[in-house]
């Protein structure tokens, strides 16, 4: 697991070294340094390079490793806009073709907005390397040579942008680069312009598949090959990912030939930033079968593992089981390095990027103290990712020529190749797919090709016009399995991934998110029942073994226990403001020792509605909506009086506290209190609120009142007025431990990370099912203090997204699908038998 470490503000040397120490204490061995929105140092300037020295030096001192990132934000290739702004010949440009009144055609070209580079121009890429890679190599030479620096990450270098043509929208537009027409003539013996005009007149010809094939070859040689050669020469890995990996049409337009391009990296990468884990029909976001398999083919081609960027787009309150599931999806496709989004120095990057919030990082209470749980799981997943699939693997040809033609020609009224549908059907039914290029040889037993109309051909048998269901039936007929998973009625199980490896082991991953499944593992005819938790993984060694714990002899609920409920932090309540910058809070009874927490982070910015930062004076492409703001310090009033915030903030979360100030504690009377933003932008940033109230209070139906200090029962935090609480809540009580041979404690906490202590002993942490703990035998029959600590994400403190109006669209759902957080159920599982209780993965 590799934290994606976003550098914001102006970190001091002490802060840098403390950050590295905090990463290592979680058992994490490396991190990636990422220059992100909110960085207040000159990118690639002296202070930035000195900061990188501090990171590398501290990593070396601790025996850790560092990954570099080759850009400010993304896409890669510009050195924060310097490359294209130095030379218009290096700027992204497109041809545009128009029809004249007489029916002839007119060609023109136009440049993209400033800052967008043409990655198909070798000289532009060479300049990018000179400004970025060479500067790092000179400044960080020691850490290149002693292998502290492992590699450099390149991010979406083929990213598209809108190009505005002065004459209006052309009939067709496409990327222009030097030498294109000569390359086309050499490949076809024809003229590019003649073939484009023929296509415009007749809609006939292969001009677009040829053009995008050539563009892919140029992209590979100009960009990936130059970067790879530089990395090879300096003894580090080239990794990263392309744009539009999930869509064959978008990938063709942006990358030309994604199979060819990704094979240019020494550690091929992918991203899965939507965090999809649900294979049921209609689920959104949908699992990216094409992305995974494009990455897998490149991993197999290179033979040294792969890398995935994960989780970036949230939702922020995804439970750890979801993050684990996506990590294992990567492992099932040969990916063994997991970039975990997002660890930040502070959250000021949200000023520009406030359309999404990642579910990992120390801003989340569960992650801050227990990221090691996910890091430990990453090591297990990586070990399994490096295994070799032994059976039920089929080849599928990537339909690049068809995708390229349709990407440019349009797909209205046409059903194109359904690569996604075939991969999904085969993978969810216990087969493994290996993508191969259109003309590549393979020794796999079945080879499928995608046809128009969403049909398929199989090359070994000569069968054509197959549906995805036909292809599945053919695989089942031709490819027997030594290991498979069945439903209890004996039919093959679906909506899961299954792999069997050459060492005789097998792995099963549940892609049904809410249902534990009672299944049967069949190995060489021997059947073994097992329980597969929702979103869970089950690992089978080469030797068959019982996979279920014995059924408890009795179950005793702790529902009648009276608990003390303590909180690790104050409760907080966002003040929601309307369009006029006014808001209210209603208090039912006086509150003691509360504080107002005021935003102190004001930054100038200009950003498109999709989240792309642009220069404050940059003119956007036609059709881009731009949000512009010039920084104005915040000031607030409460009930007509100015709010004074003399203290540094200690009431929120790490990464948020540095961006806020707080008042001294005060008493808040009962009644309605009115708040106003008298200076500063409107409160339209969901993830960076303007004003909070913090203290020991509860909230019921939007009304605040003192929190009860009495005993509580089991229940969600919202039942106690703590729906917005962000931190760790601990239920504690003296309990009688059952006097049985073996006892296990089972909890339901809404899937949140949970720690249990009994009689002062730490029994450990659980972050996914089963939420069960073995009770020490010497405590049987005794009374002891039971402490159950449940940790939230950061999401609760943002409040209800329906309560405000936000100026940027959310890239993903704001909130995850899991239920309420709390201590929802607790049971003793008593087992009198001598057989040991076995852990279910």
What are these regions (language model features)?
Residues 2, 12-18, 30-31, 45-72, ...:
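Carbohydrate-binding surfaces of carbohydrate-active enzymes
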Residues 673-679, 743-745, 784-790:
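Extracellular beta-strand-rich recognition modules
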Residues 34-130, 141-142, 146-149:
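Acidic/aromatic-lined carbohydrate-recognition and catalytic surfaces
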Residues 669-671, 769, 775-782:
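Glycine-centered tight-turn motifs at strand-turn-strand junctions
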Residues 224, 229, 728-736, 743-754:
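C-terminal substrate/ligand-recognition segments
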Residues 803-808:
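Flexible, surface-exposed loop regions and adjacent strand-edge segments
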Residues 680-687, 790-799:
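Short acidic/polar inter-strand loop motif in beta-rich domains
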Residues 748-756, 763-776, 795-797:
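Membrane-proximal, cysteine-centered motifs at transmembrane boundaries in secretory-pathway
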